A protein has these predicted regions:
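Bacterial Sec-dependent N-terminal signal peptides
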Residues: 1-29
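Extracellular ligand-binding/catalytic regions of CAZymes and related secreted enzymes
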Residues: 27-32, 38, 60-64, 201-216, ...
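A glycine-rich, often tryptophan-bearing local segment used as a flexible ligand/cofactor-contacting loop or short
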Residues: 94-169
C-alpha cells in the first residue's frame, strides 16, 4: 500500500511538471519579430514560396515571429518600430511609397533593426516607369543593374571574410545551384564590405556575361543597421543547398543581434 502511494505521488508530481513545462512553452515570448517584404506572382515566386516555407520551420526552431507583406504602403516609422529584422525577399528597390522610403532610410541609418536582402533587391535602374532610387543605389555600393545570365547557372562561391558571423560554419568554397547571376555598371567593392564572390569561370553552363571581380555577398558598414545582401535567390532549387540555408539562418540571427549557432 505504501509503495502504491509513493507511486501515485511520483506520477502526480511528474504530471504537474509536464503541465508546467507545456504552459511555460505556450506563454514563451518570441525572441524577436521580423518583417518579410516579398515579391509575388512573378518569376521569383518559386524561390519566395520555398523561402517562406523554410522560414516557418526556422522561426519555430529559433522562437521568433515574422509577418509577410507584398507591398510597401503600410511601412512607416511606427510600423517598422515593431520589427527587429527586415527581410527584403526579392522585392525590388522601386514601387516604394515616399513614406516607406523615408521610414526605411531612418531604420537603416539609425540602426533600428537589421536588414537582409536577396537577389532582386539590387535591381537598380529605371524599371516599370519608376526612377532609380539613388539612396538605395548608394546603399548597395553605388551600382546600377546591367545584365544577368538568363539561362541560369550553377557556380562556385568563394568566401572572402570567413570571420564574418554570417559565414560561421561555412566552408571557404561552396556551390550555389541554378541561379541567375547579376552584373552591374561598376564593381560595388570600393564602397562595401565584400564577404564572398562568385568564380565566373565555374559557371555551368558557361556564360560570356561576366564582371571579372564579381562580389555576390556584401555588407555596407557605413550603415548603423546590421545589413547583408545576397545576390543569389532566383530559383527554389537554391533551398537544396545546405550552405545557402546555413547562411540565411546565420544572417537572420546576426541581423537580430544574436550569435549564429554552429
Amino acid at each position: 500500500m505504501k509503495k502504491r502511494s509513493i507511486y501515485y505521488l511520483l506520477t502526480g508530481l511528474l504530471l504537474v511538471c509536464c503541465f508546467l513545462s507545456i504552459g511555460k512553452n505556450l506563454t514563451k515570448k518570441p525572441s524577436f519579430h521580423a518583417l518579410v517584404l516579398t515579391e509575388r506572382s512573378g518569376i521569383h515566386e518559386g524561390f519566395v514560396v520555398a523561402a517562406l516555407d523554410w522560414l516557418k520551420d526556422f522561426s519555430v526552431e529559433q522562437n521568433f515571429e515574422f509577418e509577410v507583406i507584398n507591398k510597401t504602403d503600410s511601412i512607416s516609422d511606427a510600423y517598422l518600430s515593431h520589427y527587429q529584422v527586415f527581410i527584403q525577399l526579392n522585392y525590388p528597390p522601386y514601387m516604394w511609397t515616399d513614406q516607406s522610403k523615408a521610414a526605411f532610410i531612418q531604420y537603416m541609418e539609425d540602426g533600428r533593426g537589421g536588414w537582409i536582402g536577396f537577389h532582386h533587391a539590387s535591381l537598380l535602374g529605371e524599371f516599370d516607369g519608376y526612377p532609380m532610387w539613388d539612396w538605395f543605389s548608394q546603399f548597395m555600393g553605388g551600382i546600377r543593374w546591367k545584365n544577368y545570365i538568363a539561362a541560369r547557372a550553377t557556380a562556385t562561391v568563394h568566401v572572402e571574410d570567413k570571420n564574418h558571423p554570417v559565414m560561421k560554419g561555412l566552408p571557404e568554397t561552396f556551390s550555389i545551384p541554378d541561379d541567375e547571376w547579376y552584373t552591374y555598371d561598376k564593381n560595388p567593392r570600393p564602397n562595401v564590405h565584400v564577404i564572398a564572390n562568385v568564380d565566373e569561370s565555374s559557371y555551368q553552363p558557361p556564360s560570356d556575361i561576366k564582371m571579372g571581380d564579381h562580389p555576390v555577398i556584401w555588407s555596407n558598414d557605413k550603415m548603423k543597421a546590421r545589413n547583408i545582401y545576397f545576390q543569389m535567390g532566383h530559383h527554389a532549387n537554391i533551398f537544396h543547398s545546405a550552405e545557402f540555408k546555413k547562411m540565411f539562418a546565420n544572417a537572420i540571427l546576426w541581423a537580430a543581434g544574436k550569435d549564429p549557432v554552429n
